[in-house]
Amino acid sequence: MTDAATSTPTVEDAYATYHERRELSVVQPKGSLALVNTQWIDSEQTIWGVPGVWAPLSDGESGLRVMATPADNIVVDGVLVDGSAVVRGKDDPNPSEISFSDTVTGFVIASEAGAYALRVWDANSEGIREFGSIDAFGYNPDWVITAAWTEIPGGVTVGFEHLKDDGSTRAEVVPGSITFSKDGIEYDLAAFKSGRALQLVFADGTSGVSTYSVGRFLFLAPNPDGTITLDFNRAVLPPCAFSYNFNCPLPPKQNRFSVPIEAGEKNVLKKDGTLLHEE
């Protein structure tokens, strides 16, 4: 007789646990719901919501410069700013940590063009206070796909539009092709490198109907046998579904499914069940 306490969790149980952890992740002090500002700095200026005067550094230097008095209570790398301090960017081997208060922190990000922005997180943001849940489809085994993975030597460059880039594209390296057939339709998808994973940005027949209109993300890793598993139950909402201060990539044409993919996350909901952000 099997002891229920020691029985192997079902796929559905594992998915439920994954979803709970996902909801916890977005309300962390630097989770997606905590981002309250992303301000690109091209000249000396103040930044909404935080003290100090911020300025770019000389070309080739990583980060920003902040000018402040002790009364501003800006702490960079554990030191209270009194005068000016260099805040190293994410592209530096040792990026700086910034604290403005017990709940508000900052971090400097970099663009491919060498521009820098201050991101500000608030562990007590309006988004965190209003958050109710991430609405999602129930586990759907029909959308666990084993696809063929074909590596492309040197990769191929694909232009991805971004939500706030007014139609311009950013070049991303796609290191291989993802191909499969489902219900008589052939697919050839483009996923770009994102850290150690591949990031698939896609839209489908549910986008703007029952799921977030911008699209969704799926993070992947090729298998040693030349296949790649697409478990769309793990499809997540992009960060811009949680905060308007993110600029998310949009699905290229080849990643736009005409059919509905009724698996994965749908929308971010407030405590009262309404959408957190009107799209």
Q: How would you name each of these model-derived features?
A:
Residues G176-P224, N233:
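Acidic/His-leaning functional-site neighborhoods
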Residues W48-V50, D77, S101-T103, S181-I185, ...:
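Short strand-coil-strand connectors
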Residues T103-E172:
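Surface-exposed beta-loop interaction hotspot
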Residues V79-V81, A85-V86, K90-G106, G114, ...:
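Phosphate/adenylate-binding glycine loop and adjacent helical scaffold
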Residues D3-P51:
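N-terminal cleavable signal peptides for secretion/export
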Residues G52-L57, S62, T103-A110, Y187-A191:
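Broad, structure-driven detector of short, well-ordered beta-strand segments within folded domains
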Residues P9, T17-H19, V26, A221-E279:
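Long, compositionally biased interface segments
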Residues I41-G89:
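Forkhead-associated
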